[in-house]
Amino acid sequence: MEHLTLGPLTRANGTVRLPGSKSISNRVLLLAALATGETRVRDLLDSDDTRVMLQALRTLGVAWRQEGDDYIVTGAGGNFPNKSAELFMGNAGTAIRPLTAALALQGGNYKLSGVPRMHERPIGDLVDGLRQVGAVIDYLGNEGFPPLHIQPAGIRIDAPIRVRGDVSSQFLTALLMSLPMAQSDSGRIEIEVVGELISKPYIEITLNLLARFGIEIERQGWERFVLPAGAAYRSPGEIFVEGDASSASYFLAAGAIGGGPVRVEGVGMASIQGDVRFAEALNRMGANVMAGDNWIEVRGTERDDGRLHGIELDCNHIPDAAMTLAVAALFAEGTTTLTNIASWRVKETDRIAAMATELRKLGAVVEEGADYLRVTPPQPWQTPADGIGTYDDHRMAMCFSLAAFGPLPVRINDPGCVAKTFPDYFSVFAGVTG
């Protein structure tokens, strides 16, 4: 197995230009494909997950081309040319879930599959929602999980659609992105969320981008959404992809731990991403934070001992970036408790279990629950002989790069898994640390 040994690191300072947001990139690609007209997408993330979406769209007959760093997508006007296709979705939840909903409305024959871990990630609540409007979707493996077979069906909407919100916000996102194409006698479509909606900021991203493509959705609290029926998606002509706020978290945390200043560019206070609020959490831990519309800068604490301090935080608003806090907690005085993170269980790996296991290898005392993690720093630090496992999870690898600020070197196993969202992460990280 390939591995990378880092540290011990003693400083962090510099400026990082962030790659595009994964969440925004794949949403924009699908919306551009469904729209009428040509869309020029600037600063699209170049990663495994976006390549999966691009390949799927090409297989479905959607034309796109690359011009320099831009991607130009020729929209299909809501009707994919190819009505039969087998699509391999890798481990890209931001691709398979919205595409499942879009394809259910296409009147075609489609099969969607992925890597083994994808076949363990739930999709049943989305399928249940689509079946309510007449979609015909069969499971080809275990009930409630991919792979899927979507068959031609007559879609009818004559009642509110109910979807669970407490497992993944991507189910709701998928319905919001595709159901406006459907017809309804009333001219409107209602979606009711069952249970507490998690990861609300990701729904804000979806609503914001839909508006850019001409689809205005009425949100009534977080329990009900009213969509236009029979709507036409219109290309905005050109759209910029923000820098990835989740990826920003590793560099901002490095600034807090390693003294800084570390500045990230491409995301700031004008961002539509919830993970931008990660900087607020660092500030609560004692770091110095400055920000503008398109940048954030972090320096270490001004305490005499230079240490951050532990906090208790409801992480529903920063579900991905909260992972970074779990590793930053190694460098804080006292215990850090992260709550409302149940969605970690159904990500690229069971992130609560994986994070707890690897933090303990470094000597931390960790308590894990169904939806929380409690971390007390190591006394003393330990170096695991077998290195830090990354579980084929890009965020595990990037998070644990921060452990290199400890007093001992740290070995990251399978560092190449960062290709899912940030292929050159470790070289960029090396450029601002030492």
Swiss-Prot record:
InterPro entries: Enolpyruvate_Tfrase_dom, Enolpyruvate_Tfrase_sf, EPSP_synthase, EPSP_synthase_CS, RNA3'P_cycl/enolpyr_Trfase_a/b
A GO CC term assigned to this protein in UniProt: cytoplasm
UniProt GO molecular function: 3-phosphoshikimate 1-carboxyvinyltransferase activity
Keywords, ordered alphabetically: Amino-acid biosynthesis, Aromatic amino acid biosynthesis, Cytoplasm, Transferase
Binding residues for 3-phosphoshikimate: K22, S23, R27, S168, S169, Q170, S199, D320, K347
Sites where the protein binds phosphoenolpyruvate: K22, G93, R121, Q170, R351, R395, K420
Top enzyme class: transferase
Record-listed E.C. numbers: 2.5.1.19
Subunit details: Monomer.
Family according to the record: Belongs to the EPSP synthase family.
Protein known as: 3-phosphoshikimate 1-carboxyvinyltransferase
Organism in which the protein naturally occurs: Cupriavidus necator (strain ATCC 17699 / DSM 428 / KCTC 22496 / NCIMB 10442 / H16 / Stanier 337) (Ralstonia eutropha)
Name of the encoding gene: aroA
